Amino acid sequence: MGRRYFGTDGIRGKVGDAPITPDFVLRLGYAAGKVLASAPGRAASGARPTVLIGKDTRVSGYMLEAALEAGFSAAGVDVMLAGPMPTPGVAYLTRALRLSAGVVISASHNPYHDNGIKFFSADGNKLPDEIEAEIEAWLDKPLDCAASDGLGKARRLDDAAGRYIEFCKSTFPAAFDLRGMKLVVDCAHGAAYQVAPHVFHELGADVIPIGVAPNGFNINDGVGATAPDALMRAVRANHADLGIALDGDADRLLVVDHTGRLYNGDELLYVLVKDRIATNGQVEGAVGTLMTNFAVEVALKEAGVQFVRAAVGDRYVLEQLRERGWQLGAEGSGHILSLDRHSTGDGIVSALLVLAALKRSGKTLAQMLEGVTLFPQKLINVRMKPGADWKGSEAIRRAIDSAEQALSGSGRVLIRASGTEPVLRVMVEARQATDANRHAEAIADAVKQATA
């Protein structure tokens, strides 16, 4: 059964345009509620399902929360409201409170005018494709509201923030604290604005918070992981030891060192793997994506660590980790997974893992990454006619083969079609930027000529 609305990270779009409308979200809540109520063992036990709803700081979150709550209530499902809460916080609380499911109202790193809905199962994992398909099937059925005595009830979870703060702190080694460290924490005017500064402060750090004044319209606007320049300036201006950049729903992390240098998810993955090797003796493998920088793959293999590339998207990184029984994976954008700490990517927990690695090693980030220099990447988006057969073009194949032969193990070529528009993405990595640029442009020219 296919899916019409769910993508790789829930349902997302511009508020007011289908499907991110109040009427659709109400029906979505009802449909999800009916699926939860019919889950194996649920009907037999007679227990009423309970879901947790969290959101980020977008002005539309209040409207969509009310619609979602109404839909669940109509399906006979109880609701707990967490208020503004990072996506990984909802995943944790759903699992810790033994709830039926968790729901996050957020569009993550997107601008304020977008929003979305994503679900977590009772164990804090994203819903399987087949459950999302079941929910979509219920969207086509009439909304048959429960009788008055069967309506779901709603209440606020008053201690949600405190519970999540304590969970985050519990992932940091008891032998360490952050006393003597000055940290700039950028919360992107998003879901972590109330919790992230407290986590680091309660562990002893001198915290300088930025991006903690949400007004409903400024989430991710010039701050956070998608706009790290503000953090880089703040770290230098305040002579801080480290800067921590989260995105709107706090499932991503980028880090800035004391010099103002930015470190992405690829580099942080390498740091965490090296820390695990130092503490545990070995790491069997790690997972990146098709976009992970080639230099990180080379460095991990030199350290004796297997490296696997998943499709782009933390959902696919998670799938590969589970399939292999590994713990560490990441995307360059800052989604970092450490499955022995959390079931999903968590920007705050990932920052604590990095800080623990620095404490254990006594090194700076630059020192831990010594010898690992990211390869320059050249990305060219080539527009094509819809349906153009670029895979069957001999000219494109020759251009790709020529680049791969020239790079000969010192770089790589990645060609992939966009899933949302008629664009072919041509990416080349090489040790020298001039080589990456030259080969990418040659392939892009071949694509343009072959698909004109």
From Swiss-Prot:
* Cofactor comment: Binds 1 Mg(2+) ion per subunit.
**Recorded GO CC terms:** cytosol
Top-rank taxon: Bacteria
The record's listing under InterPro entries reads: A-D-PHexomutase_a/b/a-I, A-D-PHexomutase_a/b/a-I/II/III, A-D-PHexomutase_a/b/a-II, A-D-PHexomutase_a/b/a-III, A-D-PHexomutase_C, A-D-PHexomutase_C_sf, A-D-PHexomutase_CS, Alpha-D-phosphohexomutase_SF
User: Per UniProt, where does Mg(2+) bind?
Assistant: S108, D247, D249, D251
Q: What class of enzyme is it?
A: isomerase
Q: Where is the signal peptide?
A: none
Write down the HAMAP family for this protein, in alphabetical order: GlmM_B (MF_01554_B)
* EC code(s) of this entry: 5.4.2.10
Record-annotated active site = S108
Describe the function of this protein.
Answer: Catalyzes the conversion of glucosamine-6-phosphate to glucosamine-1-phosphate.
- PTM: Activated by phosphorylation.
> What catalytic activity does the UniProt entry give for this protein?
alpha-D-glucosamine 1-phosphate = D-glucosamine 6-phosphate
Which family is this sequence assigned to? Belongs to the phosphohexose mutase family.
Would the keyword Zinc-finger be found if you checked this record's keyword annotation? no
* The protein's name in its UniProt record: Phosphoglucosamine mutase
GO BP terms: namely: carbohydrate metabolic process; peptidoglycan biosynthetic process; UDP-N-acetylglucosamine biosynthetic process
Originating species: Burkholderia mallei (strain ATCC 23344)
Annotated GO molecular function terms are: magnesium ion binding; phosphoglucosamine mutase activity; phosphomannomutase activity
The reply to whether NAD figures as a keyword in the UniProt entry is no
Necessary cofactors? Mg(2+)
- Provide this UniProt record's keywords sorted from A to Z: Isomerase, Magnesium, Metal-binding, Phosphoprotein
